[in-house]
């Protein structure tokens, strides 16, 4: 999980989701997991 100021999709399988007021990215590739800090 990377914590970043700006999250974005890295590949076409990445999905942007809003959870508890935070933007997170989930993907089939675990390296692409991100959360807004």
Swiss-Prot record:
Signal peptide: none annotated. The keyword Ribosomal protein applies. GO terms for cellular component: chloroplast; chloroplast envelope; chloroplast stroma; ribonucleoprotein complex; ribosome. The keyword Ligase does not apply. Keywords: Chloroplast, Plastid, Ribonucleoprotein, Ribosomal protein. This is Large ribosomal subunit protein bL36c. It comes from Arabidopsis thaliana. Pfam families: Ribosomal_L36. GO terms for biological process: translation.
């Amino acid at each position: 999980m990377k914590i970043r100021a700006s999250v974005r999709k890295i590949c076409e399988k990445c999905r942007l989701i809003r959870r508890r007021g935070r933007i997170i990215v989930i993907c089939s590739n675990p390296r692409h997991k991100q959360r807004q800090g």
